[in-house]
From Swiss-Prot:
Motif (Nuclear export signal): 88-97
Similarity section: Belongs to the papillomaviridae E1 protein family.
Keyword line: ATP-binding, DNA replication, DNA-binding, Early protein, Helicase, Host nucleus, Hydrolase, Isomerase, Isopeptide bond, Nucleotide-binding, Phosphoprotein, Ubl conjugation
Residue numbers spanned by region DNA-binding region: 144-307
Pfam family, one: PPV_E1_N
Gene that specifies this protein: E1
Disulfide topology: none
Cross-link (Glycyl lysine isopeptide (Lys-Gly) (interchain with G-Cter in SUMO)): 513
Protein name: Replication protein E1
UniProt catalytic activity: Couples ATP hydrolysis with the unwinding of duplex DNA by translocating in the 3'-5' direction; ATP + H2O = ADP + phosphate + H(+)
Region (Disordered), start-end ranges: 579-604
Hydrolase found in the keyword field: yes
Amino acid sequence: MADSKGSTSKEGLSDWCILEAECSDLENDFEQLFEQDTDSDVSDLLDNGELEQGNSLELFHQQECEQSEEQLQILKRKYLSPKAVAQLSPRLESISLSPQQKSKRRLFAEQDSGLELSLNNEAEDVSPEVEVPAIDSRPVDEGGSGAIDIDYLSLLRSSNIKATLMAKFKESFGVGFNELTRQFKSYKTCCNDWVLAVYAVHDDLFESSKQLLQQHCDYIWVRGIGAMTLYLLCFKAGKNRGTVHKLMTSMLNVQEQQILSEPPKLRNTAAALFWYKGGMGSGAFTHGTYPDWIAHQTILGHQNAEASTFDFSAMVQWAFDNNYLEEPDIAYQYAKLAPEDSNAVAWLAHNQQAKFVRECAAMVRFYKKGQMKEMSMSEWIHTKINEVEGEGHWSDIVKFLRYQDVNFITFLAAFKNFLHAVPKHNCILIYGPPNSGKSSFAMSLIKVLKGRVLSFVNSKSQFWLQPLGESKIALLDDVTDPCWVYIDTYLRNGLDGHFVSLDCKYKAPVQIKFPPLLLTSNINVHGETNYRYLHSRIKGFEFPHPFPMKPDNTPQFQLTDQSWKSFFERLWTQLDLSDQEEEGQHGESQRAFQCSARSANEHI
């Protein structure tokens, strides 16, 4: 009999029911279930230790970098390699001596953090196809198509922004930026005139700058072609490059990298014609009158004929009238006249400026010396005190002499003989202790009368007395024993008022009489028997008291040019000085000295 299919109900064969799961109320408590079920057929299936972040993030970062680098190399092979040389220079391949192959030095660069690589990629040149057209850009001034493509990306990605701007400037204006300007390397150097080339200026800001700059400038020249805008600004006050950049960046809302700035060429006729001709066109905006450096080179006038020839006599006349005797003063002051004086402009353009300055100084000294010799002492004093400006009081000198216990009447009598160079009375000695005001008193007199000072330190030279032949009055300050010995030995005839032979440099000895000679010393020569032969030749006055000072450390007695001017005017008659109206012939007025070749009645 075949076995029946299915299960059987016999109890002896139903052991599987014993293995069934037991029901419990805790069947949903998974945490308790897992805690109780510790028996497992798989060992160490679960790790109950603390979790740690491995290096999976670093691995992911490396994989991303490798993928980015691979994509970048593919793009560089596709776009940059065929145009690397063309972007550097279109003519580089034709003049290259190396094989015609592209440089791939940086094409397969080593792996890096990615920062430097990204910066290098941004610095690469971009092909002309990658251009962003400007929206509402300005129309081309001369025959343009109207719409202009402004290559913003080429400027941002260029490794040499200045070279890129200069190339775009030359492309727009047809002339190099350096052909119109001279270079200032320092940012702190000030200049009144500046040439600015600004890239990618917004139209509204471009138009507003024409009005805003008028308050800062005397002359404005503005023109925009394409993306480039050219400014010529003549500021009212000198500005350095940093100040100009700060002004333009705030006014035009541009970055400093978008600006080229240099001062213009002032002596270049071609550059001046560029500004002059450009300002006459309709595309340029100008405000104000032409600056002098443009007008002088482009505008013809009667000044051009005068400036072409240098008149040496006019330079000598100018130096004589202004009392310039030294070469540095003549050169500097005459150069300052160049903007107004056409003869000074011609002198600056001459290649023998130093020669003319030396000859001018020599001629002025000759004229001044001849004029001095022709004048009497009265006329000389009158001329010099008239040159003093301001007013003083003669009582300061009188009070100082009385403070030093000097009899003013005696001093006035000796001073009168001193000024007239009376024989054996033409030398006055002021002696006394130190800090008594001897040198201050003597120097103030020499200063107002434009006298000369002798220094015994030069006594080793045989020409140390030469200033005595070139002055109306002289001073020998701080005479010591060696100097007294020299005077007692060699200068007795000069103090007597006789002619002496004076050795002068670069000429034969000349015959002169000593001018009035003023001495200061700490030694009373009248109390020294060794110098008894000088007692009758020198009139001495003692200053025994220290020079008085105010609490603010200023002199109590004002020994100034104004005080001496008042002194001579007040005591002119007592000093027996002649009336100036009687100096001329029959009261006729004397006209000013003229040493120029121009006639007196010539038209100005």
